[in-house]
C-alpha cells in the first residue's frame, strides 16, 4: 500500500463557506486560487482550494448531478483543472443524506434538493474524485440528520467507496466528516479528519469553544487522522491579537489550517500571522500529536482565565515541546511554569519564542506575562523528558447521540421550569415561534452563560426549524458546562 495515498499531516488551504456561503461562483473560486499564489500562501503550504455548498443544480433523469448554470456555467471540473494548473489541489463538498445544508438554510430550493450522496454514493463519488479529479471531499450531515440515518453506517459506506477510488486511481484523496460533533471512535478508521464541534463564528469565545471541544480527544489524533476544529475565522473581524491566538491554537492542536476569508483583502499583519513558518511547522509536525493543558487559572467564581498547553514534537514524551501560554481573559496575567511540569528534565538546551523568532535564555522556570486574548508560544528542548499525564484523557470517549425529545416531553419540561430557547435568527423568530420561547440565536450562544443563565444546572430545551442549529446548540452549551440540555430538534411547522 502506497503511503502517498494518505495525507499524513493536517490539511492546509482555503475553503469557500465562511466567506461566501452559497454565494459562490467559478469566478470567485478562481480569484481565491490566484490569491493563494500571489500572497505567497501556497509557498507556505496552503495548497487546497475547497468548493463548499452552493454549486448544485439538481439531477438529470439518470440521477447524474447538475450544476448551477448561473454560478458555474462551465460546470465544476474546470475548477479542479484550474487548481491543478496552478500547482494547487482542489476540494469539493457533498452531503451524506439527501438535501444539503444550503437547501435547508440558504434558500437553495430545487438546486439543493436530492443532491446529497444518499442513494447515489458510488455515482457521485466517482464523478467528483475520479472523473473530475478533486483531491478532497467534505461530507456534511444536514440531510442525513433530517432522514434519521445512522451516521456510522452511512459514513463508513462513503469511506469505503472513497478508499476504493483512492487505490484504483493511485491518487491521494482526503475525506472529511462534517457532523458538528465528535462522531465516535469508529471515525478514525473511516475518515482523514472529522469536525468535533458546532460551526465556528468570528468571535473569540467561539474560537476557544472549538479548542475546548477537543480537550478529551487527543487520543484520536495522529498521522493521517485528525480532529477538525473547523475553518479558521482569521480575516473575518477578529483583532490581530485574537487572530494570533486563533492560529496558534490551531497549530498546537494539529488541526487543518483552512482559511475562510477573502484572501485578496488580507492585511500584511494578518498575512504575517498565517505565514509564520515556525508555527506552521508545529501544526505539520510528523508525529501529529495534539496539545493538552497542564495548568490553568480561574477567577474566584470559577471562570477559566488562562492555561498552559504542551505539545510533544517528533514523538510522544519528547524532549522537544511547544508550550503555549494562553490568556482567555480581558486583563493581563502572569503564568508560571517549571520545566519539569512540562516533562522537560535536566538541562534546558534551547528556548525559542515562535512569535518574536528570538532565542531566549535557557532556564528551568518560566514566568510569562500574557496580554488579554493573547498567546506566547515557546519551543523548548531539554536533555531528557518524562511522561506528563494528560488529565483530560479519561479513556475512550463515549459517543452520545443527539437524540430528540418529543414535543410532549419538551412542554412538560417547560412547565416544570425549563428554559425553552429558539436558536434561529431574530427574523425567523419574529415570524413564528413556540409559545414561551426565548430567542438566543446560535451565533451568540458562545457567551450565553455569562449574560443569560449563570446557573449551569438550569434545564434548557433548544429547537430550530430543521434540526442542525439546535443540534449544534446542544453540543456548544454542553461543552460550556451546561449539564441539562435537551434537544427538541427541528419543528417543521415553523
PLM regions and their residue ranges:
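Structural recognition of the beta-strand scaffold that forms the well-ordered cores
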Residues: 10-16, 45-51, 89-94, 135-140, ...
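Catalytic cysteine-centered active loop of the rhodanese-like fold, especially the PTP/DSP P-loop
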Residues: 440, 449-494
